């Protein structure tokens, strides 16, 4: 008969305490309901404005499309608010990109440049991932992801996260063979399969 190891390999933990969510006035707004409220021209403008403001609490990836749709709305107030929200999110990332570029340019060696180079690849990816750029700017951002990811991977080839970003970038650019290579390498370097 086979030998069974009877040692306990699992640790016991205390169950977490459940806390009721705080009563948030925007908690009931979901992207589907917001889109419905904004697209219904018969909804009073104050309700449509509340729906638009509820998007501030949603991730940019989910709300950018709704905000872009609102840019063609008949109400000037809604259009201006949607534009301001999109512009604010894009400016936050652009400011972080400028900071990382300044740090990148000040450092003389590839070893020292690794951290800002990786950060630049991630930040340009965020512009694309959050749907904050379109058209030529999206294409430019994907090129910058490729440039900085490749540069960072030359110094630290075992960076699983960068390989995954590279795979996603190649997928969006339509090069599925390179994308598969990026994902395969990311998994080999320890990137979790569930992400």
Describe the residue ranges of each PLM region.
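Amphipathic alpha-helical repeat scaffolds of TPR domains
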Residues: 76, 80-83, 87, 91, ...
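Amphipathic alpha-helical scaffolding segments comprising HEAT/armadillo-like alpha-solenoid repeats
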Residues: 28-38, 60-71, 94-102, 163-164, ...
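N-terminal alpha-helical membrane-insertion module
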Residues: 1-21
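Short coil turns that delineate tetratricopeptide repeat
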Residues: 42, 111, 154-158, 188-191
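Start-of-helix register in tetratricopeptide repeats
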Residues: 46, 115, 161, 178, ...
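Structural detector for internal amphipathic alpha-helices that build alpha-solenoid repeat scaffolds
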Residues: 14-26, 47-58, 69, 80-91, ...
């Amino acid at each position: 008969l086979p030998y069974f190891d009877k040692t306990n390999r699992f640790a016991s933990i205390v169950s977490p305490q459940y806390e009721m969510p705080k009563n948030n006035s925007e908690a009931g707004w979901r992207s589907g309901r917001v889109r419905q409220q904004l697209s219904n021209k018969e909804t009073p403008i104050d309700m449509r404005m509340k729906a638009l403001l509820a998007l501030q609490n949603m991730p940019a990836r989910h709300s950018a499309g709704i905000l872009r749709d609102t840019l063609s709305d008949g109400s000037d107030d809604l259009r201006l608010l949607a534009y301001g929200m999109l512009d604010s999110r894009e400016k936050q990332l652009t400011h972080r990109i400028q900071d990382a570029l300044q740090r990148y340019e000040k450092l003389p060696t590839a070893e020292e440049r690794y951290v800002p180079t990786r950060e630049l690849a991630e930040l340009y990816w965020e512009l694309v991932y959050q749907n904050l750029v379109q058209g030529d700017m999206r294409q430019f951002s994907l090129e910058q992801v490729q440039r900085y990811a490749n540069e960072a991977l030359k110094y630290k080839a075992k960076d699983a996260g960068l390989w995954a970003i590279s795979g996603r970038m190649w997928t969006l650019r339509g090069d599925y063979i390179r994308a598969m290579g990026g994902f395969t390498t990311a998994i080999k370097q320890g990137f979790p399969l569930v992400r």
